[in-house]
A protein has these predicted regions:
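The feature captures the conserved acid-bearing segment of alpha/beta-hydrolase catalytic domains
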Residues: 176-238
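N-terminal cap/lid segment of alpha/beta-hydrolase-fold proteins
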Residues: 20-49
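C-terminal catalytic histidine-bearing segment of alpha/beta-hydrolase fold enzymes
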Residues: 234-277
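Short glycine-enriched nucleophile-adjacent loop
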Residues: 139, 159-171
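Alpha/beta-hydrolase
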Residues: 58, 88-90, 180, 242
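Alpha/beta-hydrolase fold nucleophile elbow
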Residues: 144-156
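Short substrate-entry loop that stabilizes the transition state in hydrolases
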Residues: 50-52, 60-97, 186-187, 218-219
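Alpha/beta-hydrolase active-site loop
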Residues: 103-143
Length: 277
């Protein structure tokens, strides 16, 4: 009987802690339209009415980004610093309608003709970007979002999306971009995405801080895009590979996910604060 009481007490304590975290970040699940598809996103904001500067967070290629700690962990970085966060989930991910990009690419890859490489670029430039920008448009309607102080960030496929969105800063309203490990998993086998992201360096006019962990799948995105920025005199486009001072599990792609976000948290908050001055 005593053991059952302890278990019940522990369960209540855990539920209370989870409820406190959700309340602290004012987490809300929302839906929005991208064309004829209904997509899902998560919004967070500090206590109070705002409006707050807002981080648009782009997830990677994982099937269920809404089912893990990713978005809450992003909120834990930015909400205490005074930011709202909006994380749209692109088509086919989690509860969002539509086809899943990885399934589409796998079908093309199975043909063995290299068409998956050009398709990767095409889907990022069209469907994936359309979904992200639909999410941004929705976020701008939220009363706690300051549409004049928008920044964008994301990892892996989300890093690609961050760079593509940054190209449209003038029309969308982004003030800075933080791509993390953009295309690192596909870089070595996809020259098409290499060239497309080099083109982004030329197109982007807002501050960019591209970061990677020391053990990423490829460090070429930081090296190549940083060199291209230096070559054309884009001083606002900076890259940084972190020193291997973190645990091994956080030295890998996207800093190992949510558990490694603390590694770049301080740099990200400072970067955005400087860009929004």
């Amino acid at each position: 009987m005593r053991m059952n009481t302890v278990r019940v007490t522990l369960a209540i304590a855990l539920l209370t802690a989870a409820a406190h975290q959700t309340a602290r970040f004012n987490k809300t699940r929302v839906t929005f339209k991208s064309g004829n598809l209904t997509l899902v996103g998560y919004a967070y904001h500090p206590d109070g009415n705002g409006p707050f500067p807002t981080v648009i967070w782009n997830h990677g290629s994982e099937k269920n980004p809404g089912g893990g700690p990713q978005f809450d962990s992003v909120a834990a970085v930015f909400v205490p610093a005074g930011y709202a966060v909006f994380a749209p989930m692109r088509r086919g991910h989690s509860d969002s309608e539509g086809g899943y990009i990885v399934d589409t690419l796998n079908v093309a890859r199975a043909r063995g003709d290299g068409s998956d490489r050009t398709l990767l670029v095409k889907l990022h430039e069209t469907q994936q970007l359309d979904d992200q920008l639909a999410g941004v448009a929705y976020a701008k309607t939220l009363p706690f979002v300051d549409a004049r102080r928008l920044v964008v960030a994301g990892c892996s496929f989300g890093g690609i999306q961050t760079l593509l969105a940054a190209e449209r800063a003038r029309s969308v309203g982004f003030r800075a971009a933080l791509p993390i490990s953009p295309a690192a998993l596909t870089w070595s086998r996809t020259p098409e995405i290499q060239e497309r992201l080099k083109r982004s360096v030329h197109e982007i006019t807002i501050p960019v801080l591209l970061i990677q962990p020391p053990g990423d799948a490829s460090l070429e995105p930081a090296r190549v895009l940083g060199a291209e920025a230096a070559r054309i005199g884009k001083k606002q486009f900076r890259t940084m590979v972190y020193a291997p001072t973190m645990p091994d599990s956080q030295r890998v792609h996207c800093f190992g996910g949510a558990k490694g976000f603390h590694t770049w948290a301080k740099d990200a908050v400072q970067f955005f604060a400087d860009a929004l001055k």
